[in-house]
């Protein structure tokens, strides 16, 4: 006996997965044992476990294999073994999406669901709902209602959760179970109450008034379940956010009072959820924020690692938006730097980096360096994000942060981690001229041993863009040419393009660049040879205008739209040359910053980001006559022209071209007994505007969104392009059957609906573009080709610099440059370049001196008048 026990212990200590070498074919052959009589419950349970293991490891069963296995599994219902029966339920759930004719087990599952054995009932409900569709659900509806209000908590919870899953396919049937869900909400069991609230909210969520009544009722009574209370807090916050968005918020909100009361709940879970909600609500004032932060501060001293982690993670997020509110917790956060849990320590330091003083930066960076190698890439990303915000806050500390980042670059890590570091270094280079030389040097060292092609290409592009304007451009050519010798074809092609930039921008380096490009023409790769030949031919002509137009100019067209336009051109008769000017330029897309640090879903693929112009161009190309107005300059965000509760909802998107503006009206008919035809919008145009075309919507059925367009030509006089236009929606109404949507007769009557006025502003006509060096661009614009307009304004309605910047941006349609008081340049419709410099001073109000440089005097005056 002693030997047997020791042998088992040795096998267990040896570790390893006993099923890692399972083969699908052999396991499926073993399922023949399910047909034996009597059923060997122990062996069948073991086989079922193997099947579930294979399925959960991603093994794919064919429809025939799954069906045979499923039907063999149904033979096991004759056994009364509880463990095996529960495994059968799991097998049915896993195989039901693959196998055919799974409804054959409906009667067996219904019998178990309504039987006396409670251990069978809950899993039988879950299995039954996995094979039930909307057509079969009515047959078991009565049983489901009974199970929802069952006294046995697992049965009731199983029915409630299954109902939630069924709601996605049979929502109308599940809505009839609201009374039973309401009864479950009054249960004493914490899970039943939680699941009951979840189902009841799902049933009523489309009815805003019903949800509000439900929340108001529940906030006045004490919920036994902390899970339900947490969910109720989330619903209340969602309602408050909707009220804020619609402008119906009140200062003394009963819902906010409920959330604030939950800060004093006896459950730590509820207290944290309430604190998390308070700090994330936009309406929260400093007093309320300090109360929530005090709660989080208490949690920082908890003996539970989960509470400490939750508290410091939330404070990390608060520090992004309200650093002063977290300053009071700096001592507690310093104590967490030495926490045994590295996740907590990392978040504590990164929070301190956001809230601490400039003098503490070096000390904190040294503390991070002691354990940064021990943490995972996921937490290293959080450190990099904190350093990025630190660079914005303390630009003079760029030497410390740059050295730290370069050290992290040399360590082992994945592509996402290294990309985050490179992004941060590039941000420092672009926004801090003093850090440019050091940053480029660190990146040059990194590409000497970079295993990621995408990063190497990106860095080479940056070197080609910034290197020619550095103090010693020649030092970077050696690093770049090394890539031509040592790297793969993709990197070599990028290196050739970077070398050509030096030849175009640095005349003294041109002879050396031509020698290098001549060598590259011998490359074994077509792309590298073609690029080298292309750049060599242009540079060899020593024509600065050619160099600027074909090499140094970084403005490119939108590649997706270029591809689409070329395909359309090739499908045509090819009688005319392709006109590149009709393709919109690629605009700057700001990188998306994920404020929810520590939530990183690596399974979800990244969606390629496109700008608004690329999204809208496909629709616009279908408009008759649109090709004559030229390339799309800018598409604006939608503006609502009606209230959301009205019978017809209309939103307007303004598409600006060089000399025209296209108004796109997206219309929705919310009346089920009406069909609208010949839907159009008539505009009251001010003097100078000319209507060129109106494209109506032929039919607008109930619930559908359709578009109608109006093409308008701008006035010749640029200042007159700022105007307010009246708008009226006109249409033909036909009464119809709400069930079918078919009109009762062919006759109808004309009707109209007055819309909100439409404003055409400077911001609508201005497209942001990014200059890497604003100061250099500003100085280069001090020539005879440019005109300058300057004026001083008293912004009496604002009291802070941030409000002043926001006001300027609202009028001009530009974005603030990080780390400066400058507003980046932009391009007015028609390609007129614009540079704007704004100086702000705070006294009783904010005084602003606005200086505009542009290649068109009318545009310069228009921009200054927009603020005035």
Curated annotation (Swiss-Prot):
Keyword Transport: yes
Record function comment: The coatomer is a cytosolic protein complex that binds to dilysine motifs and reversibly associates with Golgi non-clathrin-coated vesicles, which further mediate biosynthetic protein transport from the ER, via the Golgi up to the trans Golgi network. Coatomer complex is required for budding from Golgi membranes, and is essential for the retrograde Golgi-to-ER transport of dilysine-tagged proteins.
Biological process according to GO: endoplasmic reticulum to Golgi vesicle-mediated transport; intra-Golgi vesicle-mediated transport; intracellular protein transport; organelle transport along microtubule; protein secretion
Main localization, broad class: cytoplasm
Basic residues bias: start-end ranges: 1-11
InterPro entries named in the record: ARM-like, ARM-type_fold, Clathrin/coatomer_adapt-like_N, Clathrin_app_Ig-like_sf, Coatomer/calthrin_app_sub_C, Coatomer_g_Cpla, Coatomer_gsu, Coatomer_gsu_app_Ig-like_dom
Protein known as: Coatomer subunit gamma
One cellular-component annotation, GO: endoplasmic reticulum-Golgi intermediate compartment
Source organism (scientific name): Anopheles gambiae (African malaria mosquito)
């Amino acid at each position: 006996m002693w030997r047997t026990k020791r042998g088992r212990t040795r096998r267990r200590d040896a570790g390893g997965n006993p099923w890692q070498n399972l083969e699908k074919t052999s396991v499926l052959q073993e399922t023949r044992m399910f047909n034996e009589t009597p059923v060997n419950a122990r062996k069948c349970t073991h086989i079922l476990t193997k099947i579930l293991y294979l399925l959960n490891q991603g093994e794919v069963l064919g429809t025939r294999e799954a069906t045979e296995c499923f039907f063999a599994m149904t033979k096991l219902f004759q056994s009364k073994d509880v463990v095996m029966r529960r495994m059968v339920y799991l097998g049915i759930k896993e195989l039901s999406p693959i196998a055919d004719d799974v409804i054959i087990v409906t009667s067996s599952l219904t019998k178990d669901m309504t039987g006396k054995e409670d251990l069978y009932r809950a899993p039988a409900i879950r299995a039954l709902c996995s094979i039930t569709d909307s057509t079969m659900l009515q047959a078991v509806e009565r049983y489901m209602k009974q199970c929802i209000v069952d006294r046995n908590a697992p049965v009731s919870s199983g029915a409630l959760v299954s109902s939630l899953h069924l709601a996605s396919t049979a929502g109308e049937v599940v809505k009839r179970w609201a009374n039973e869900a309401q009864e479950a909400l009054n249960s004493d069991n914490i899970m039943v109450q939680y699941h009951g609230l979840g189902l009841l909210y799902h049933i009523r969520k489309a009815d805003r008034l019903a949800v509000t009544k439900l929340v108001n009722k529940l906030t006045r009574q004490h919920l036994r379940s902390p899970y339900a209370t947490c969910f109720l807090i989330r619903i209340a916050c969602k309602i408050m956010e909707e009220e804020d968005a619609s402008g119906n918020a009140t200062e003394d909100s009963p819902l906010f009072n409920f959330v604030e009361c939950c800060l004093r709940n006896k459950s730590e879970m509820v207290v944290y959820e309430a604190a998390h909600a308070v700090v994330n609500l936009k309406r929260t004032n400093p007093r309320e924020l300090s109360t929530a932060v005090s709660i989080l501060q208490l949690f920082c001293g908890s003996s539970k690692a989960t509470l400490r982690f939750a508290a410091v993670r939330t404070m990390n997020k608060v520090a992004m938006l309200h650093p002063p509110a977290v300053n009071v917790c700096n001592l507690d956060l310093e104590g967490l730097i030495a926490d045994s849990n590295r996740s907590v320590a990392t978040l504590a330091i990164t929070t301190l980096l956001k809230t601490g003083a400039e003098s503490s930066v070096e000390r904190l960076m040294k503390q991070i360096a002691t354990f940064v190698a021990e943490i995972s890439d996921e937490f290293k990303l959080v450190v990099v994000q904190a350093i990025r915000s630190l660079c914005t806050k303390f630009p003079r500390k760029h030497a410390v942060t740059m050295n730290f980042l370069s050290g992290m670059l040399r360590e082992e890590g994945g592509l996402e981690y290294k990309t985050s570091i490179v992004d941060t270094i590039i941000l420092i280079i672009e926004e801090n001229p003093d850090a440019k030389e050091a940053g480029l040097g660190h990146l040059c060292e990194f590409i000497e041993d970079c295993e990621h092609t995408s990063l190497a290409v990106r860095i080479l592009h940056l070197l080609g863009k910034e290197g020619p304007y550095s103090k010693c451009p020649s030092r970077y050519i050696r690093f770049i040419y090394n890539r031509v010798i040592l790297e793969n074809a993709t990197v070599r092609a990028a290196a050739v393009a970077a070398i050509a930039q030096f030849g175009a921008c640095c005349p003294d380096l041109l002879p050396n660049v031509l020698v290098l490009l001549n060598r590259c023409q011998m490359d074994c790769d077509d792309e590298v040879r073609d690029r080298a030949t292309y750049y060599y031919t242009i540079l060899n002509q020593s024509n600065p205008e050619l160099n600027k137009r074909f090499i140094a100019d970084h403005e490119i067209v939108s590649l997706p739209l270029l591809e689409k336009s070329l395909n359309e051109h090739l499908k045509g008769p090819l009688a005319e040359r392709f006109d590149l000017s009709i393709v919109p330029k690629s605009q700057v897309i700001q990188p998306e910053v994920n404020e929810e640090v520590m939530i990183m879903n690596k399974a979800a693929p990244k969606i390629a980001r496109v700008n608004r112009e690329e999204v809208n161009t496909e629709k616009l190309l279908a408009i008759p006559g649109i090709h004559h107005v030229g390339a799309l300059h800018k598409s604006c965000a939608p503006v609502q022209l009606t209230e959301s509760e009205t019978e017809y909802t209309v939103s307007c998107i303004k598409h600006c071209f060089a000399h025209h503006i296209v108004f796109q009206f997206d219309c929705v008919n919310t009346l089920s007994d009406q069909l609208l035809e010949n839907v159009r919008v008539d505009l009251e145009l001010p003097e100078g505007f000319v209507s060129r075309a109106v494209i109506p919507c032929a039919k607008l059925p109930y619930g559908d969104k359709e578009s109608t367009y109006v093409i308008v030509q701008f006035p010749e006089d640029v200042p007159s392009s700022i105007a307010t236009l009246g708008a009226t929606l006109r249409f033909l109404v036909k009464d119809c059957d709400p069930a079918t949507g078919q009109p009762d007769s062919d006759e109808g009557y004309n009707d109209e609906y007055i819309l909100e006025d439409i404003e055409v502003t400077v911001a609508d006509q201005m497209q942001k573009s990014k200059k890497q060096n604003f100061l250099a661009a500003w100085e280069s614009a001090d020539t005879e080709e440019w005109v300058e307009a300057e004026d001083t304004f008293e912004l009496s309605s604002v009291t802070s610099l941030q409000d002043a910047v926001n006001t300027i941006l609202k009028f001009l349609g530009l974005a603030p440059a990080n780390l400066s008081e400058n507003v980046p340049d932009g391009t007015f419709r028609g390609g007129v370049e614009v540079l704007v410099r704004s100086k702000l001073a705070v006294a009783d109000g904010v005084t602003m001196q606005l200086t505009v440089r542009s290649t068109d005097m009318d545009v310069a005056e228009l921009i200054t008048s927009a603020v005035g």
